[in-house]
Amino acid sequence: MQKRLVTRYAMPSAEAADENQRRVEGVFAELAETKPDSVSYIVLRLADDSFVHVSFHNHGDDEVNPIASTAAFAHFQQDHADRRQGGVEQQTAQLVGAYITTID
């Protein structure tokens, strides 16, 4: 079953957002290297320095999340509560439609 998750959170400063972005980029570097199957992952940094993660992945409830199981994601999670402002909002999502060309 394909899981679709949207995660949002705010950052207290541009400096905290810069560090968060570096760690997110590390996750993408590891995903590019390991190339897990059936994974789509997009992270956006908004103008107010908040972040939105959108992930699509196939794994059963008894299987490991292919994104969250990377070493780079573990590094991203370290001190995340201290880097962000407030909590994390995460919801499952239903795909209504998609059109994707090269994203830059």
Language-model segments: residues:
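Short beta-strand segments enriched in hydrophobic/aromatic residues
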Residues: 11, 24, 45, 57-58
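An amphipathic, aromatic/His-enriched active-site/gating alpha helix that lines ligand/cofactor pockets
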Residues: 26, 30-40, 56-92
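Glycine-rich beta-strand-turn "strand-cap" elements at beta-sheet edges
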Residues: 1, 9-11, 38-50, 75-104
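A short local loop/turn or secondary-structure capping micro-motif enriched for an aromatic residue
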Residues: 14, 60-63, 99
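Short, low-complexity N-terminal intrinsically disordered segments enriched in polar/charged residues
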Residues: 1, 19-22, 33
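Short, surface-exposed ligand-recognition loops at beta-strand->loop->(often short) alpha-helix junctions
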Residues: 10-22
